[in-house]
């Protein structure tokens, strides 16, 4: 019978702790963990309670020395901000782990659990877990302090246009919303003939001025006012003002050009219709279909005014129409529009249907008009116009009527309109009873001009039910298709607030 000899087991001998005499495995300090912790505190010098400052107005935390950052509760950004407060005192230890401990949100306390390591006596590495409490104290930041002191803006952009309506500003509002240029403003105030944008920095105001110059024909002027001056550091505090003046010509305006400007544009007629305003003014001659563009610099060298306002347009009915084909322009003429059709029409005012008086004129809307259609136009024959260039024209070259656009039933168009636009939060100087009508006309312009609405965001209005074509008479009014609309999404619908937790039943 043979016996299997077990392999010898390797075992390390224990030693006694030099302080309390408890048997322990050998270590460089020759001490147990309990005695080692009583002798050495590796968290010594690290404060257990720290103060951080929080601005209640803008909900930002102070990051020394002078910057303010926005951090959500228990976020990585807030953890990094708290650890930076302890960075100087933790230079001799090694950070292993850090995490938040739950506290009541209204307790103004933030607790962080830290795990650190440090080499102690004779090369022994000791690890310790402890908690640091951060007390949140309120302190108003400089930006909010300026707001409360009513001295918060450093630059203002004053946009003005000398017109009787606000359709240009409605269009600018949509462009600003699309490009999110309103986010840097500290205040937006709507006043008569314009709107003011207030900024905390001059750079943001200059960015708005550059945007306006690329969007609409305008001219700007900058000025600044000295607020304070420090003679010791030789620093100056200025408030800057940018005055932006938009040309007083809008879509569907009838204008009379100067003879010199009309000649430089290809010998086109002096009486023209403005069909669109982008970064330049788009004009068309209703007698020849000749088109031209006038930029801002050209306009201010050769200014001209609108001969009529939207309220002065009268409604006419088409009595007869004759399309003019093979219209040839003279030598040196400019471009001719391919999107319009020249026609001769006989029209009669709807307010004078009991009489037999009719007007004869040419129009650029021959591709849209039929006998019996209603159009809006300007009556030159019975209007009292005081214009420098029109008074010097040969009366035989002044048309009796200039037709602008087709007329549709406004109530039917409003019922079919299942889309909406967003608006900026702004202060209004005084309520204008005519604002609603002007805004409705702006919506109609968007429906009629596809090029105009390509630059803005149109949202589907979920509160309106689409009207079936069979339920109402189709008068051929232009409409915006569903493919051009965006869904009006809001992040606060699902969370109950920006940055909040998802709501569940």
Curated annotation (Swiss-Prot):
The answer on whether this UniProt entry bears the keyword Transport reads: yes
Region Disordered, annotated ranges:
467-505
Name the InterPro entries on file: Nmd3, Nmd3_N, NMD3_OB, NMD_SH3
The record's disulfide annotation reads: none
A molecular function (GO) term: ribosomal large subunit binding
The protein's UniProt keywords, in alphabetical order, are:
Cytoplasm, Nucleus, Protein transport, Transport
Q: Which GO terms describe its cellular component?
A: cytoplasm; nucleus
**What is the similarity comment for this entry?**
Belongs to the NMD3 family.
The protein's role, per its UniProt record: Acts as an adapter for the XPO1/CRM1-mediated export of the 60S ribosomal subunit.
- Assembly: Associates with pre-60S ribosomal particles.
Q: What is this protein called?
A: 60S ribosomal export protein NMD3
What organism is recorded for this protein?
Danio rerio (Zebrafish)
